[in-house]
Amino acid sequence: MILTDLEKLVTDYTNKDHSSQGFNFKSSEFDYEWEVSKLNWYFYLDREDASLFVADFQTVRDYAYFRIEFPLYLYHESEFCSEDSEIFKDVDLEFSFRNGWLKITTIITEETDLHHIFDVLFSVLKDYN
């Protein structure tokens, strides 16, 4: 998996000022209908040993749902669950591992610190990169 490409995509996007478009990652102010609707990301990292990543944002009433999925072949799945599940829980990231795919989800509200969530996500996943 090419985690640095995913991290760069998210970092580049969140560092830009989108307030004129109705969404500001830095202050976490949402105009759900405008910005989140065009923030559906489906992308493929094309390399022999690369993984397929699927990530998207979906608007659900007064919050947004973030999901990212990718193949992750762990030799010690139990270590991931025991060591990292608490870290994810602290920032309300939920995960499941099924058929070689890791799925991570969270709910984003106006109070959500997106930078912190992504920092935690990437710091944990780098251990498996």
Predicted features and spans:
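UBC/E2-like fold recognition across ubiquitin and ubiquitin-like conjugation systems
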Residues: 1-35
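Amphipathic, interaction-prone secondary-structure segments
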Residues: 22-83
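Ampiphathic alpha-helical segments that act as solvent-exposed interaction surfaces
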Residues: 5-17, 74-129
